[in-house]
Amino acid sequence: MKRTFLLLLLAICAGNLAAQTANDSLPKLDPKLKATLNATDQAAYQIAMAYSDQAVAKSKLFDLMVRNPDDVRYREALANLYFDSRQYASAALVSLDILQTNGKNIGALEIAAYSLEQLGALDRALPHFESLHLLTGDNFSLYKSAFIQYSLKRYEEAMNSVNMLIKSAKADDKVGFPKSQTETQEIGMKAAALNLKGLIYLDQNSMAEAKTAFNEAISLDPAFDQAKENLKKTN
């Protein structure tokens, strides 16, 4: 996990240096020519996306990025393309590059958080989920923060996040839980938070408290299969 992020960090540093060197050495284009080239590449990008040709779309985005190094839109589009094609390392690199310039870029925070999570770098994904919640008030980002804190055995932080979530969860907030290999069960956020609270207690051998939390989760959503299975572990 640490090695994965170290490689990402080295790649970011090398990429920034290479990009700066390349930008410094590029000749200045006539504004009209630049606008024409931009319009041509943007049109080609749109056509490539319409035909699901991501390779050409990425190529055009790179051309646009080189020509317009200060326009973050092209990096954002590239990060989305990488993420959608499950190239999580590349998605993380681009989004982290964006965040170096603007740490409050919501799209980049989302892609960085989920990409780093997919790469197994949970300790690096966590601050991005936390920032997302602070900036947007999104309860799912808070749930992800709590679950990662629990996974990292940072139980006090996880419990604080869970208690915040129990208070702020809305009726239409849902979390998906796997029911089978092909089926997902949608559970209310408050019930999901109580289930996570039970898991935190369970990890600390606080069986009575865990049992109470699981029972509360089931009372909110009687069809909550995972909470029922977790409840059995308290007997």
Region roles according to the model:
Residues 74, 108, 141-142, 174-175, ...:
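TPR alpha-solenoid repeat register
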Residues 18-73:
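N-terminal leader/linker segments that initiate helical-solenoid repeat arrays
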Residues 69, 103, 136-137, 170, ...:
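Short coil turns that delineate tetratricopeptide repeat
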Residues 77, 111, 144, 189, ...:
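Canonical tetratricopeptide repeat
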